[in-house]
């Protein structure tokens, strides 16, 4: 069976503002199945942003579990992320899920992987998915050389990733916390 491929999710934190954005393309093999998927969402009373890359069903499964962890830990992002990563690493069924998450609240941004990693990105910039390297490089260059807002940096870096990665389109959804 063919795998669902790619997307690009990028987050930029600058001062007390954070933006998280993603494209909308879902690809199965060499076919674009959907161009307007929503891979960036607000959860936990709109206080937490989450973006996902990887298998769509896998990502939704992890998103549900992450929301439950946030509820259990009263919105403590780091604690919820670590608990999800531990479950993901140790649970036989969860270990098969192929997805990654970026989560952000007013003070913290984290990348959560299926290897049990919970990473606090250096410089407040991170990206995942097939176009992640392009988006992250663009975001770093823009953050270091301009005064653009996090939202503007995310928008421009997604545009650049969409120009370079065949699994990333220009249908962007960007959420912010200020």
UniProtKB/Swiss-Prot annotation:
Catalytic activity: ATP-dependent cleavage of peptide bonds with broad specificity
Gene3D superfamilies: Glutamine Phosphoribosylpyrophosphate, subunit 1, domain 1 (3.60.20.10)
Annotated positions binding Na(+): 162, 165, 168
Database matches in InterPro entries: ATP-dep_Prtase_HsIV_su, Ntn_hydrolases_N, Proteasome_sua/b, Proteasome_suB-type
Molecular function as annotated in GO: metal ion binding; threonine-type endopeptidase activity
Keywords: Allosteric enzyme, Cytoplasm, Hydrolase, Metal-binding, Protease, Sodium, Threonine protease
Subunit field text: A double ring-shaped homohexamer of HslV is capped on each side by a ring-shaped HslU homohexamer. The assembly of the HslU/HslV complex is dependent on binding of ATP.
Function: Protease subunit of a proteasome-like degradation complex believed to be a general protein degrading machinery.
Name assigned to this protein: ATP-dependent protease subunit HslV
């Amino acid at each position: 069976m063919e795998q669902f491929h790619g997307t690009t999710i990028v987050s930029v934190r600058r001062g007390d503002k954070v933006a998280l954005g993603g494209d909308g393309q879902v690809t199965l093999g060499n076919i674009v199945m959907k161009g307007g998927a929503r891979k960036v969402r607000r959860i936990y009373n709109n206080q937490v942003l989450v973006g996902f890359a990887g298998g769509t069903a896998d990502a939704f499964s992890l998103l549900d579990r992450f929301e439950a962890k946030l509820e259990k830990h009263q919105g403590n992002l780091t604690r919820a992320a670590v608990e999800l990563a531990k479950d993901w690493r140790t649970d036989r069924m969860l270990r098969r899920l192929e997805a990654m998450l970026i989560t952000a609240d007013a003070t913290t941004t984290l990348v959560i992987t299926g290897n049990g990693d919970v990473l606090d990105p250096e410089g407040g910039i991170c990206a995942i998915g097939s176009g992640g390297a392009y988006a992250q490089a663009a975001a770093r260059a823009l953050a270091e050389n301009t005064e653009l807002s996090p939202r503007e940096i995310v928008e421009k870096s997604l545009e650049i990733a969409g120009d370079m990665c065949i699994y990333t389109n220009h249908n962007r959804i960007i959420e912010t916390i200020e």
